[in-house]
UniProtKB/Swiss-Prot annotation:
GO terms, molecular function: imidazoleglycerol-phosphate dehydratase activity
Name of this chain's protein: Imidazoleglycerol-phosphate dehydratase
Gene name of the encoded protein: hisB
Similarity remark: Belongs to the imidazoleglycerol-phosphate dehydratase family.
Compartments, record wording: Cytoplasm
Organism of origin: Staphylococcus epidermidis (strain ATCC 12228 / FDA PCI 1200)
Domain of life of the source: Bacteria
Lineage of the species this protein comes from: Bacteria, Bacillati, Bacillota, Bacilli, Bacillales
Length: 192
């Protein structure tokens, strides 16, 4: 199933669709580094994204990065609501040379976000690295997930951020995998 949201504000214009089918993604945010990270996210999560985005990047990349996180989170929430069953929990460690990142995901219906990741530099190219946390916070809260992201070892900032995106993607893929018994993985019988 394909989920789509068009979101237009005074700051950004977004047309984003998401599918859980692992086909080729098309990502055009106008922010090269973010495009790169989202491409890695789709590859390692098995999700397909189509993103056409424009915005006030002449100011900086904050609005477009955060708004894309918001919409991807909303799309993930729709995916989870319609999925017959899922594993719920996922954890992934991802090394990238000297860097090691860990992400733990719970599709809980209770939004909580912990980002214990001191990045080594304030910029990668022109991209403000503080936006990594803003992107994931927006995604997690809007998807109603519990997520803990920890950068355990670092060095090169590009490697740090890449390991974070990949570890999140792989943990999410595990948590979205179909549950073997076909039931909702909650003693309540429901995740809201």
């Amino acid at each position: 199933m394909n989920y789509q949201i068009k979101r237009n504000t005074e700051e950004t214009q977004l047309n984003i669709s998401l599918a859980n089918n692992g086909t080729q993604s098309h990502i055009n945010t106008g922010v090269g580094f973010l495009d790169h990270m989202l491409t890695l996210f789709t590859f390692h999560s098995g999700l397909t994204l189509s993103i056409e985005a424009t915005g006030d990047t002449y100011v900086d990349d904050h609005h477009i990065t955060e708004d894309i996180g918001i919409v991807i989170g909303q799309l993930l929430l729709e995916l989870v609501k319609t999925q017959q069953s899922f594993t719920r929990y996922g954890c992934s460690y991802v090394p990238m040379d000297e860097t090691l990142a860990r992400t733990v995901v719970d599709i809980s219906g209770r939004p909580y976000f912990s980002f214990n990741s001191k990045l080594s530099a304030q910029k990668v190219g022109t991209f403000d690295t503080e936006l990594v946390e803003e992107f994931f916070r927006a995604l997690v809260i809007n998807a109603r997930l519990t997520v803990h992201i920890d950068l355990l070892r670092g060095g090169n900032t590009h490697h740090e951020i890449e390991a974070i995106f990949k570890s999140f993607a792989r943990a999410l893929k595990i948590s979205l995998a179909q549950n073997e018994d076909g039931r909702i993985p909650s003693s309540k019988g429901v995740i809201e």
